[in-house]
Amino acid sequence: MTELSGIITIVFIIYFMIMLGIGWIASRQTRSPLDFFLADRSLKAWVTAISSTASSESAWAVLGTVGLSYTEGLSAIWFLPGCLMGYLINWFFIAEKIRKQSKEIKAVTLSDYIENHFNDEKHVLRLISVVIIFSCMMAYVGAQLTAIGKTFDAIFGVPHILSISIGGMLVLGYTMMGGVRAVAWTDFIQGLIMVFGLVVVSLMAVQSLGGLSSMLVEVEQASPTTLEWMGGKSIAAFFGSMVGLLGIGLGYPGQPHVVTRYMAAKNTQVIKNGTWIALGWGLLIYSSAILLGICGQVLFPGLEDPEHLFPKAAEQLLPTPLTAIVLIGVLSAIMSTISSQILVAASTVAHDIYSKMLKQSLSHQRIIFVSRLTVLFLGLGAILIALGETRVIFWFVLFAWSGLGASFGPLILFTLYWKETSRQGAIAGMFTGFVITLVWKITGLSDSVVYELVPAFLLSSLAIYFVSKATKKNIKTPKT
C-alpha cells in the first residue's frame, strides 16, 4: 500500500464513521413518516441550500464538468449559465411556493403534491408519477453505484464487486437510519467537501502555471482553440451545442430529490437565505471546474480520459493528506446523489403505493419500519443492478435527468402559476415529457439536432396548456 492510499484509507474510515454517526443521531429524531421523508419540515438555510444542490449534481460536478472544460475549452462556459438558470428557476420561482402549497395540502412526496393539488381520487396522477420516478431513479442509482465502485477500485485498489457493495451499504446505512434528515445533513457535509476540493485544486493549478496571466499564455500556446468562445466550431455547430448546454438548466425544476428538499425547509425565510447560498455554491463549483479544465490542457496534455483530470491534478498539486480529503470529495459527490435518489425511490413504494394507494392504515412507527425496509430492499436491488450489466444502465441514465426534468418540471411550474391547469393536462404533460425524451434519445436526435430535454420540456408545456384549455371545466379544487 502506497503512502497516499494508506492515508486515504484512514480518512475514509473517519469519513465512514462520521456518516454513520449522523445517521444514528438523525434516527433518534425520527418519530413519524413526516420526519422520515421531510425531516418534519425543519431544515435550515445552509442545509437546505447545499444539500439540495449537492444532491442534484453527483460526480458530474467534480468529474464531468472538469472533463467537459478540458475537451471543449472556454466554450464549455455555456453550461454555467444553463446550470445557474436552473438554480434561479428553482429558488426564485419554485422553492418558496411549493413549500407553502405542499404544507397546505399535506403533501409529503412529489406524487402527493401532484395528486392532492388536482384532488385526483382515482390515483392516476400518482401512478404515472410513481412509474416515472421509480424507473428513472432505480436506473440512476444503479449507475451511480457503478461509478462509486469504480472510484473505490481506483483509489483503494478494492475489487469492483466489493467496492460497489461497500459503497452501497454505507449509503444504505445512514439513509435507513435517519431518512431525509440524515440524507440532508450528510449531503451538506459532502457538498462542502466538493466545493472545497474543486476550489483548492483549481487555484493550485493556476498557481503552478505562474498565475493567471502566465496560465493564459501557456494555454494559448498549448491549444490555441481552448480559449476561443466558440471552441473553433462553426456558427451552426456552436449554436446547437450552446442551446444544449443552456438546456441543461431545464432539468432542475423536475428533479424529485431536489424539489422535496424545498418542501422540507423550515420556513420561507430559510428559502430566501438559501437562495444566495445555493447560487454561491453553484458559481464556485462550476467556475472552478472550468478553470481547472482549461489549466489541464497544459498540465496534462493528451489526457486519454478527461474525467480523470480532477483526481490526477489533486494528486500532483496537493500535499498527500489534502489529496486524500479531495479524493474523498469525489466519493462525496456520488454518495450525496445516491442517498437522495434511493430515498425518493423508496418513498414511491412505502408512502405513495403502500400507504396511499393500497390504503394500509398503520401506526407511525410501523410506517417508518416499512420505509426503512423499502430503502434496504431497493438499495440491495440497485446494488445487484450495478453488479450486473451496466451498459444499459449508463445508456438509460443519460436521459434519466431529462426524463424527470421534462415530466415534472413544466407541471410543477404550471401548478404554481396557472390556476387553469387541469388533471387531464397534468396527465398529458407528464406522459408527453417522458415519451418525447425517450423517443428523442432512441432515434439519435439528441446527437444530431439538440439535447432531448429542450424539445421534451417545450412539448410537455404545450401539452399541459392545450389539454388544460380543452378540459378546463373538469378542474377540481385541491385537497386541504
Predicted regions, residues:
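Membrane-embedded helix-loop-helix hairpins and adjacent transmembrane boundary segments
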Residues: M1-T480
